[in-house]
Amino acid sequence: MSTLFESFEVIPAVDMQDGDVVQLVQGERGTETRYGDPVVAAKQWVEAGAKTLHLVDLDGAFEGDRMNATAVDAIIDAVDIPVQLGGGIRTANDAASLLDRGVNRVILGTAAVENPDLVAELAESYPGRIIVSLDAADGEVVVSGWTESTGIDPAVAAARFADYGACGILFTDVDVEGKLAGIQSSVTARVIDAVDIPVIASGGVASLDDIQTLHTTGAAATVVGTALYENKFTLADAMEVCESD
């Protein structure tokens, strides 16, 4: 289906803050619900059938320093499936050290928007391993932990980063992130239509119908956090929805 995934994937999120797994509402600090040890969570998702894990260092996203590096290292050592990581990856050296350490794909957000040449540089050195994260609120790309609006259209940005060599786009709809209120597929569809590389959809997934919609819309995968941690459905059920087509 894509160069990143053999078929549509439902990817569990392991978002880390202060050493715990957390889920935030619309990315806002102070809204977090905590779900315990990241390594335990990662192992549980592997046992549940995950084919990829999505790790986010939220302290890195907010502060710019990778505060959960120890947990990331432990997860890499503990699981035998591909791991993609975002949050606080600001420089080529940051990305290279993670890729060399065993992270399969790094996700560049703020750093990519502020310095697109970084994407091109890394994509040349690590082809197929650089994902650009585009987070949008009110139809505009936001950066710095979703706190600053750029005025950039996410579909336009996605096309530009595809040209720069990104192997995929992680698109997060901040307007619905963490609210368990369902997705806004039209926004995601615009990004999918703008590029020929895989788009991983994130934000607002609350039901199996949401997953089916994203699959039908053309997403290569979806990252799911709150809905899985709150037992709205199981990972097995979510994966089965897309395998039954």
Swiss-Prot record:
Ranges in a coiled coil: none
InterPro entries, A to Z: Aldolase_TIM (IPR013785), His_biosynth (IPR006062), HisA_bact_arch (IPR006063), Isoase_HisA-like (IPR044524), Isoase_HisA-like_bact (IPR023016), RibuloseP-bd_barrel (IPR011060)
Primary site of residence: cytoplasm
Keywords: Amino-acid biosynthesis, Cytoplasm, Histidine biosynthesis, Isomerase
Recorded catalytic activity of this chain's protein: 1-(5-phospho-beta-D-ribosyl)-5-[(5-phospho-beta-D-ribosylamino)methylideneamino]imidazole-4-carboxamide = 5-[(5-phospho-1-deoxy-D-ribulos-1-ylimino)methylamino]-1-(5-phospho-beta-D-ribosyl)imidazole-4-carboxamide
Metabolic or biological pathway: Amino-acid biosynthesis; L-histidine biosynthesis; L-histidine from 5-phospho-alpha-D-ribose 1-diphosphate: step 4/9
Cellular component terms per the entry's GO annotation: cytoplasm
Active site residues according to the UniProt entry: 15 (proton acceptor), 135 (proton donor)
Enzyme class: isomerase
EC id: 5.3.1.16
UniProt subcellular location: Cytoplasm
Presence of the UniProt keyword Magnesium in the record: no
Domain of life: Archaea
Pfam families: His_biosynth
GO BP field: L-histidine biosynthetic process; L-tryptophan biosynthetic process
Any one GO MF annotation of this record: 1-(5-phosphoribosyl)-5-[(5-phosphoribosylamino)methylideneamino]imidazole-4-carboxamide isomerase activity
NCBIfam families: 1-(5-phosphoribosyl)-5-[(5-phosphoribosylamino)methylideneamino]imidazole-4-carboxamide isomerase, PRK13585.1
Family: Belongs to the HisA/HisF family.
Protein name: 1-(5-phosphoribosyl)-5-[(5-phosphoribosylamino)methylideneamino] imidazole-4-carboxamide isomerase
Organism annotation: Haloquadratum walsbyi (strain DSM 16790 / HBSQ001)
Highest classification ranks of the organism: Archaea, Methanobacteriati, Methanobacteriota, Stenosarchaea group, Halobacteria
